Amino acid sequence: MSICFIDGAFRPTEECRLPVTDMAIQRGVGVFDSIRLYDRKAFALSEHLERLKESAKGAGIRVDGIVERMFDTIREGARRDDCPNEGNCLVKPYITGGDVNDCGRFPEPRHFVIFEEGPPICAEEYKTGVALQPTSVERLHPLVKSTNYLFGLMQSAGMSDVLECLYCPGGEVTETLRSSFFACLGGKIVTAPIGRVLGGITRNIVLKLARENGFTVEERCPLLTELLSANEAFITK
């Protein structure tokens, strides 16, 4: 069971529609974010919606007032009786390119917000770890959280034992398809700098807590060859 706020109202997600003329369908133009609700409270809501706004700007989508209205939409949705799993769920706000393509600018976007249960947490993955598939390609537009995941999904297509791809352009490890990547090397936590990767909200919190607790953090791209000597590696999203 999931609900969606679209065209000014909440309704079951399966009843919601986008016109086939929308640039999200025609050209893959759209941005989104993923926000966890815990007991009807959104985790880092302001930070996620600010990133959504910056993603939209980076994609050339006009966002006048849309993101600000999403604050109220998400808070209202979290209070609803039909909010999935009693308010412990995943919220995904989307902004699409709409129907108008003005020389690569999109002045009339559409927006909607989905509330869904989200994937279950797999305890076994936290015990044994996950497999990532290195790929030499670079993520397209790393500062834009685009709805278009096709390029990244192709890198690990058909690999049922792999969680997702690990971008390693030129042998430098940047991030995975959906997560920030960290390696513990020589007593330091090493992770790619903002500019090379999407500004992960959880990433920023992890780095802040690490520094506050005496860990040395180095913001650079670890080399793929260095991972063989890493004490450990982990991802966040």
Question: Over which residues does each language-model region extend?
Answer:
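Ordered, amphipathic secondary-structure segments that act as subunit-interaction surfaces
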Residues: C83-G97
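Helix-start/capping segments and mature chain N-termini
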Residues: M1-D64, E68-E76, T96, D102-K237
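Cytochrome P450 catalytic-domain "roof"
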Residues: R79
